[in-house]
């Protein structure tokens, strides 16, 4: 076998494809398509600006040929095609592309009509003045430098920018599997937002939006509606509608109307827009236009659309908005590299990252300046000491045979401090002392010991420095350095002073480069949020066995005394009954869990509001349920918070835990919440913290209490684990996550119930048979539900006939676990209790109905406490 053949290594093509494509994807994401959140630049932009900085192609110097810069960039830093680099330069020099141009171009750099820029050999460029703020203090070790592609040059990993460039100029790019599209903003507004964040790091998105109301495009125009902006700033994703600025002018003589367009949306090609309008007129898809012309010139844009006599200008304009790019949507997707990883970021995340970057840059700059100041002060100290001892030093130098021996003698002898003593005493002996200085040098025992560097500086001292004027200048410079060192130490020693410096520099940038907003933001009808028109109130949500859903104000139900007959909650169809009941706020989300283990999401106010006697609407008309699929559990959620879990339990005793955020932003079709085996269904859902305890109650009166931590969090499309070991024919009827002390109220089919302290229920292991929760007999019937209550609470019970009663919890006695309970609601023959719900809102005494709560003899008695041996636990 040849040498070449021995170098061939067989590889699995599938593994090689995975590895190579992943490498390619990460290279595109990190090295090409996405900007860094700190400086808002992609690598190619950063390399172009750095190359121009190295060339000295500054804003106040002569222009240089674009080809010269492109050659430096591709030769030293960016080993790609010259067209990619030149296109980047062109875009940074176009006033209609960047809100604040980073390159000052001379020549033809294209137009808003889509005209191409002239070749790079014809155009000339230099850095814009604002671009220097991106690279300010670059030479002061403020950022890390990394090797270029071949290791022959160093380039900055990120720019030490004073400008929040990611927001100010925005960014767009398509990577592998992700993309970014960040709109530009007004510099003054963004800096105001940064200052507000510096003042209060806990500021909300709404608070930041008081300073940054929305994007500010270089082409001005109008943003139609605020809702997309709010969503984008809150979540990192959103959509805004940009509309051209147009007005309808009326000729005073003829009465004819003319539409004048002064500004068009961002990234819209004006020439193509005019072609599209002409095409629509030709195809008669837009009526009422008699003439179209472009009168734009160096003074501004002006597109003239003449309207026919019998047409209405506003109607024609609205048609153009809907059918042309006079109105476009801008999809905001704020993805940037954060710590080297792509991340979708909201407005506060981006500002926080920039301020954090500035804190690091200013700290590193201060350390650098302190080191340089101390090094300079170290030399000035020696010169001041030399001037204080000028005669003996001159004598020593005159008698030294060589400069080397003179230096050695200067280092060996101690010297009087002279004027330096007072200055060092005021500033502190160690203030100007370099960190590298050994202890034997400097001030010791009232004398000054020179280092070799200081001795050399004395030998290099020119004779003119011995004049009185030069002596004073030297001492003044030394005093200024001591003051500078003191200030630098104060910055490093005080976080508040550090933030003051950052604030002062941001205010200076705002003063120098800030301007007025160009883009107007207007409200539109779509901004009238239905939710804003809905009064926040607590309501009762009911779901019948046959799937009829509705909500009613909680205030419609008056609390009644125990044993009352209740009021009708719903007009029920024959053979139907209410089996799901909860109290929620009209603005809450409702997570609807179905018999097939899927979950759907709605707002409470989207449910039908009905009177007490109405059935409501079939939930199949509100949710895309499949045939034979029904809602078996509903859960109100106010906010989808991080760290909160959704705990689920099924009738067969299976339990499962999933993070709440898995259920945010559900699609209309819903998603799988839990995989169910045949014959099982979901009976209970609750929110947990991850460290709670869980109680499962069965129809036969058993309960198991165990720690939630024994169930690990799982994804949506999983089955879960066993929570309780059930007897034959038994099923789980309630899931409770006990919070605080309180008591557990258990209700049975025949209207009986009782309260038992939570502490009475022992904590056992998961997947055991549990202990007795209530004594189940023929008299009280099987358990239909259990809830945790406090003395100030009320409960609502509902029967399969639709009767609902609301009762004070305080009227129900607290007894042990092994009892039957008392009558909570009187049921008619063949009527069973099917639902139980806690109400945590007290009602004034004036609003209560006085209903005789006395019971027939024996009915109200609490079954005596009976010693019942709990069944042994089974692991």
UniProtKB/Swiss-Prot annotation:
GO terms for molecular function: ATP binding; ATP-dependent activity, acting on DNA; DNA binding; DNA negative supercoiling activity; DNA topoisomerase type II (double strand cut, ATP-hydrolyzing) activity; identical protein binding. Changing residue 828 to S: In strain: 227. It is found in: Cytoplasm. It is an enzyme of class 5 (isomerase). Gyrase is the target of many classes of inhibitors, including coumarins, cyclothialidines, pyrrolopyrimidines, pyrazolthiazoles and (fluoro)quinolones. Quinolones bind GyrA when the enzyme is complexed with DNA and trap the enzyme in a covalent reaction intermediate with DNA. Coumarins bind to GyrB and are competitive inhibitors of its ATPase activity. Cyclothialidines also bind GyrB and are ATPase competitive inhibitors; they seem to act differently from coumarins. Pyrrolopyrimidines inhibit both GyrB and its paralog in topoisomerase IV (parE). Changing residue 462 to C: In gyrA462; resistant to cytotoxic protein CcdB, but not to the quinoline antibiotic enoxacin, has no effect on DNA supercoiling. Does not interact with CcdB. Changing residue 80 to A: Reduces DNA supercoiling. Slightly reduces quinolone-induced DNA cleavage. No effect on DNA relaxation. Residues 857-875 have a biased composition (Acidic residues). When the enzyme transiently cleaves DNA a phosphotyrosine bond is formed between GyrA and DNA. In the presence of quinolones this intermediate can be trapped and is used as an indicator of drug toxicity. The enzyme-DNA intermediate is also the target of a number of topoisomerase poisons, including toxin CcdB. This is DNA gyrase subunit A. It comes from Escherichia coli (strain K12). The gene is gyrA.
